[in-house]
């Protein structure tokens, strides 16, 4: 099962803390590459007629943890696009597994043991957010993890080839 239970153990080991500290010390470079990657990916996807990108208002500066895009085609095409992209550049993209309240841990009610009695009556059922449930099936999530021009170019070239194949 995916996400079979919820845990609230937020402690980390010294090793994990050292990794986190190193990441924080490099935050400016990490964010620089995420923004650069995100902008390039967004431009490519927006130039097609089969992707819809969530709008970012002008007053917000996007940090691009990822680029989420809705593929306006059927599920069969979703899988073909994903596989073709991997073939062209060796990179995988993600899909939205399902909306969080449809995860097994929410559906089986195990999370309730962490709630006080007032919040224990909350119900999560399919159909709660029909728009999110519909969009979830069409989402492609593109990573922005690239930390140098060579790896970014590899992905962008693969994405360009994949888009041309599906036009």
Located regions from the model:
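PLP-dependent aminotransferase class I/II
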Residues: 1-167
């Amino acid at each position: 099962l995916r996400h079979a239970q919820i845990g609230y153990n937020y402690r980390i080991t010294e090793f994990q803390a050292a990794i986190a500290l190193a990441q924080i010390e490099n935050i400016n470079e990490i964010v620089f590459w995420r923004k650069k990657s995100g902008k390039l990916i967004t431009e490519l996807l927006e130039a097609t007629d089969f992707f819809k990108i969530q709008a970012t208002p002008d007053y917000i500066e996007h940090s691009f943890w990822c680029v989420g895009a809705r593929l306006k085609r059927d599920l069969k095409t979703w899988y073909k696009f994903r596989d073709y992209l991997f073939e062209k550049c060796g990179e995988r993209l993600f899909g939205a597994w399902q909306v969080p309240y449809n995860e097994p841990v929410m559906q089986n009610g195990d999370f309730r043991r962490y709630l006080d009695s007032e919040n224990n009556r909350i119900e999560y059922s399919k159909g709660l957010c029909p728009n999110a449930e519909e969009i979830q099936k069409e989402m492609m999530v593109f990573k922005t993890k690239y930390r140098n021009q060579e790896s970014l170019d590899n992905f962008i070239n693969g994405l360009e080839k994949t888009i041309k194949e599906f036009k």
